[in-house]
Amino acid sequence: MTNPAYFPQLSQLDVSGEMESTYEDIRLTLRVPWVAFGCRVLATFPGYLPLAWRRSAEALITRYAEQAADELRERSLLNIGPLPNLKERLYAAGFDDGEIEKVRRVLYAFNYGNPKYLLLITALSESMQMRPVGGAEVSSELRASIPKGHPKGMDPLLPLVDATKASTEVQGLLKRVADLHYHHGPASDFQALANWPKVLQIVTDEVLAPVARTEQYDAKSRELVTRARELVRGLPGSAGVQRSELMSMLTPNELAGLTGVLFMYQRFIADITISIIHITECLDGAEAASKSPFPI
């Protein structure tokens, strides 16, 4: 594909067979309404994502993993100000309470799921580097599984705007928010917010532009990656696939590419976790932004 907005991936609407089953199980196990951009890119490497997910699912559905995600979420607040009042800004732009509630539901779904994807991608990346992941001794309570399936009040599948088919205006917004983060493409979160172009424009220019890639932001992103690495070592089960096992499955070029993708998305999802929590803080305050919207 020659469209510059495209980055190789398998859309959650265009998969079938084993990959479709893998995507569905990721959503149900993590209790989230989307398959992360990173996972959609990992799906382009032959056989990798279904295998890696099978090796990881049991550890990621534990109460330990849920509490680890809660900790990462709480750590993601930037604690800087003054903050713009996003609710008042949306009112001024013509949004009513019902429309703002729809935006809120999307933000809360991503706030819940982003720290979980940070754990998953970190576990996959650490395992690829043949560093220790999982197998820790934890209490039976933390080893126990949480309910599988989407929590009450969560939409089962969020519609993501396809940047390659969007209007020129929306393509420009998606590129701007990606460039603001120094990213190679827009996160799923912003593809979902692109269903309301004015919302995406406001959060990009008025909420994120003042903070993205500042010293505080970059320090917080490093903190999240560091803590996620520590947390995946404590998982009660194994996760990911080591490079040595993949050498018989992938070509050297594929193996190198996979290593780079995992490294890149570990940092990508840390950034996005911070950004979406910051947007939510500007909408509903720090406590609402940093606590799980779907507690177990």
Curated annotation (Swiss-Prot):
Catalytic activity: an (S)-2-haloacid + H2O = a (2R)-2-hydroxycarboxylate + a halide anion + H(+); an (R)-2-haloacid + H2O = a (2S)-2-hydroxycarboxylate + a halide anion + H(+)
Keywords (A to Z) from UniProt: Hydrolase, Plasmid
Source taxon at top rank: Bacteria
EC numbers, comma separated: 3.8.1.10
Pfam families reported in the protein's UniProt record: DehI
Class in the EC hierarchy, top level: hydrolase
Recorded GO MF terms: (R)-2-haloacid dehalogenase activity; (S)-2-haloacid dehalogenase activity; 2-haloacid dehalogenase (configuration-inverting) activity
Family: Belongs to the HAD-like hydrolase superfamily. S-2-haloalkanoic acid dehalogenase family.
Summary of the function given for this chain in its UniProt record: Acts on 2-haloalkanoic acids whose carbon chain lengths are five or less.
Protein's name according to its UniProt entry: 2-haloacid dehalogenase, configuration-inverting
Originating species: Alcaligenes xylosoxydans xylosoxydans (Achromobacter xylosoxidans)
Top-level taxonomy: Bacteria, Pseudomonadati, Pseudomonadota, Betaproteobacteria, Burkholderiales
